[in-house]
Amino acid sequence: MKKMFVFLLLILLSLNGVIFAKEKLVISTWGYNGDKLKKYVYAPFEKKYDVEIVLETGNNAARLNKLKLRKGKGTDLIYLASSYTMDAIEAGLIAKIDRSNLPNVSQIYQLARAPFGNDYGPAYTVMRVGIIYDTAQISDPITSWNDLWRSNLAGKISVPNITTTAGPTIILSAGRHVNVNAFNKPDLAFKSLRQMKNNVLKTYSRSSNLANMFAQGEISAGVALNFVMSRVKKAVPSAVWVDPVEGSYASINTINVVKGSPNKELAEKFINHVLSEKVQRDIALVKVDSPVNVNVKLSAKESEGLTYGKDLIASFQDVDWGSVNSNKKEWINNWNEIFSN
């Protein structure tokens, strides 16, 4: 009898554990700024919806490959950069969203609302690809993408590898340098890129590599996403950021619901939460992400280092990530022929 009582008690306790266990929302994201995101994004959502957020962290490629191998199982939401978002959609891993659960989309910039169509998730932040150069080393100001081909920059610049988020913009700029569309005439774009090669000391795959090259005096200029600027500026105070006269390239990060998620509605509520004015402002103030919510107002000091303001965002060159993805294999091969020699 005593054994039976203990047995029933154990069953009851295990059932209580199931009954009172919090619902979990599994989010695939980068591992950066974890403490700040916990404080301003995850914890408030957990409290409001009585849910536990579980993170899967890593870079774009690693996390997307993991999602492909598992066919999306076990993950509810995924943060990805533009080209990887397109890849995930084409692989059939992204669920179509119910926009009625995302009322805050009406408060964000147009370019962020439906970057891959109304069926898929919005961008929650916007960055830009521009040029950084050291004014102590380069006296003739850099103002244009075309300046990357100047003969007095031989061996002085670094550009992002083709496989990075910003990499494809180098091909687009090479095409523009000779007045062609890189998608329509890739042979001319890569011929133009080959002409720039003499100026490129090396390519980089990690932002820390670029910052280190500046710090060690190996390079005097580089193409980068704007978030790298603060790191370079810390090492090289004479470094400046340039939004080229033709316009910087827009780079967005998206949040999407993974197809097959058993928590789809909750996941959509999380996306809406991230787009809210409060969360967008809180995250901007601690320099984690640039806001896309148009209601977020920042002072000049508060917006320093961020991509902020309708005039700046309106000046961007957009990137057709669908075309980038469809040309990716050929572009990588052509790139490697140039830079592996």
Residue ranges and their predicted role:
Residues 22-87:
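Early extracytoplasmic/lumenal segment of secretory-pathway proteins
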Residues 130-137, 173-178, 251-263, 271, ...:
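A bilobed periplasmic-binding-protein/Venus flytrap-type ligand-binding module shared by bacterial periplasmic
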Residues 95-104, 121, 149, 237-249, ...:
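Short beta-strand->loop
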Residues 32-38, 74-75, 79-201, 205-215:
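Extracytoplasmic ligand-binding site segments that recognize negatively charged/polar headgroups
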Residues 258-316:
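Mature extracytoplasmic/periplasmic domains
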Residues 84-87, 215-216, 221-238:
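A ligand-binding cleft/hinge motif common to bilobed small-molecule-binding domains
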Residues 127, 191-196, 204, 235-259:
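Periplasmic-binding protein-like
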Residues 300-341:
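Extracellular/periplasmic bilobal clamshell ligand-binding domains
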